[in-house]
Amino acid sequence: MAYTLDDFDYDLPHELIAQTPIKQRDTSRLLVLDHQANTLEDKHFYDILDELHAGDAVVMNNSRVMPARLYGIKPETGGHVEVLLLHNVEGDVWETLMKPAKRLRVGTTVTFGDGQLTATVTEEREDGIRLIEFHYDGIFMEILEQLGETPLPPYIKEKLDDPDRYQTVYAKENGSAAAPTAGLHWTQELLDQVAAKGVKLVYITLHVGLGTFRPVEEANIEDHKMHSEFYRLDEAAAATLNEVRANGGRIIATGTTSIRTLETIGTKFKGEIKPDSGWTDIFIKPGYQWQVVNAFITNFHLPKSTLVMLVAAFTGRDQILNAYHHAIEEKYRFFSFGDAMFIK
């Protein structure tokens, strides 16, 4: 069946968009959707323990959000410049989104902080994208931690008191422009309890790009072009997942980024799980044939977003929109700092 963009729309009261993280990560609410039984249960995230069984694997994305927003000036004019780091091309060359782009030509220099970091535009691309090369003394990531800000999603209007609350407790690999937010609910203590139950904890890496916030503009969703994101699944992770599968356990993904990684690999290797890394622009939507993931944890996503379509590919459109309407009635909190779903 052909879907249009409006098929994935729903009305969300503005006050249900969570502006701040909940005090204790795992006390957020959890809406459990049993896809086969077509049932909904209202729980809390710490109840996820009851949903996981010995022999299952929980997959998490260990990408870390970088303080990817920098504010600088052009020394020759004093003009202000905003830079958003998208990804590291090679060495000190980065693909960035710069404002005001039309004034930033090849050869333009920008200075950050009190001059401990400078950058030169090396290539102009469309949509405000620029390649820039950084110049500095010392360690780039340490300088970035000092000078950069963590970019929050556009619908979050409040400043974050503690930047660590926009990182998962297992964030390790620098590279994301946005957090893999389903993972924000996990605490180290809860993960320890999960492991003690005989569930395997598996880490993959997918660096979340800003395209994750890019709205779908095509009425026919088939025409939408997905952004690309870098992913990696190492040999140890692949071996664990294959062992779990062989023994009849479930592969449970934490978040859409883990899903995209696992399904990219499953699609590429015709259902098999192999170590792999590369760039993925997989668009999972209704009609998609699932290869790897048996169940997953995810937050509540924006109306008309590719992430709602991804979830609908697992549940069917009507079932997920019905669950969202239930969540709205029950005043669940939505989006990045909001509550979670467990879909099985």
Curated annotation (Swiss-Prot):
One GO process term, biological-process aspect: tRNA wobble guanine modification
Molecular-function annotations in GO: S-adenosylmethionine:tRNA ribosyltransferase-isomerase activity
Pathways per UniProt: tRNA modification; tRNA-queuosine biosynthesis
GO cellular component: cytoplasm
Catalytic activity: 7-aminomethyl-7-carbaguanosine(34) in tRNA + S-adenosyl-L-methionine = epoxyqueuosine(34) in tRNA + adenine + L-methionine + 2 H(+)
Domain of life: Bacteria
Pfam families (UniProt xref): Queuosine_synth
Subunit field text: Monomer.
Entry function: Transfers and isomerizes the ribose moiety from AdoMet to the 7-aminomethyl group of 7-deazaguanine (preQ1-tRNA) to give epoxyqueuosine (oQ-tRNA).
Protein name, as recorded: S-adenosylmethionine:tRNA ribosyltransferase-isomerase
Gene: queA
